Amino acid sequence: MSKIGMSCKDCTFNVKENKEQTSCQLGILETIKTKSSKCEIVEGDYQFDRICNFRTTEEKTKEEILQEKYIRFHFIIVDTNIDKTLSILDSIEDLVTEDNRVCVATTENFKALSLKIGNKPNYFITNSFKDKKTVFEYMDDTFNKIKNGYTIVLHEDDKISKEYLDKVNEFINIKMNRLALIENSPFVVNNIIFKMLKGNKDLSFKDKLGELQQEQEIDSMIFTWEDIDEDTGL
């Protein structure tokens, strides 16, 4: 029989009884069954058409794999008020590791931001000479500095916490939702899809996603923070 997509065969976390899979040590098999359009046992192991980021044949503990596959978050800060921008930089300091990138987009505060950021290798500043840009235009300016993963876009009074990063990680990795955009502030975007659709060039990223979903007849990848709260319950 041809393979549906992914298989739990030989996965470290596959739980079997009498040579047939019954569960998953990570507790996500029920989610796989619910979210997959195809999910069935083939030769003793579940096969399905969703992507499980945790599948491995290496000897790892549950805690190790959950930490290893935790979503990589980057940050874009749109600077239109230097005091508020500096406050945002302070507020995310504990959330930023060497694997995260932080990019600040500004039109007039390059010097003050440079003094604040110093020589941190994963912090970047983009300086634009065009006034009255939209937040979306600032996003496009900065994305060449951002690596794959997901990006949180922060502007003026926006706030983000470890709790909400955990919720997004749960929503994607554990609940297996296909997330391309959280549309209410602070915005969260899937970096690969954002770059593939060329951001907001010619048409907003949200509208491009709508067209893509309609063309491919797939479920919406656009969510709100309320959706995240409801589905994760964290």
Give the positions of each predicted feature:
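Short aromatic/hydrophobic "clamp" motif used to bind/position activated sugar donors
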Residues: 151
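Conserved donor-nucleotide/metal-binding helix-loop-beta segment in metal-dependent transferases, i.e.
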Residues: 165-180
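The conserved acidic donor/metal-binding loop of glycosyltransferases
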Residues: 155-159
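Short, acidic, metal-binding catalytic loop of nucleotide-sugar glycosyltransferases
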Residues: 90-99
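Short beta-strand/loop segment that forms part of the nucleotide-sugar
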Residues: 99-109, 127-128
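N-proximal low-complexity "stem/linker" segments adjacent to membrane-targeting elements
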Residues: 56-91
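Cysteine-centered metal-binding/redox modules
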Residues: 1-66
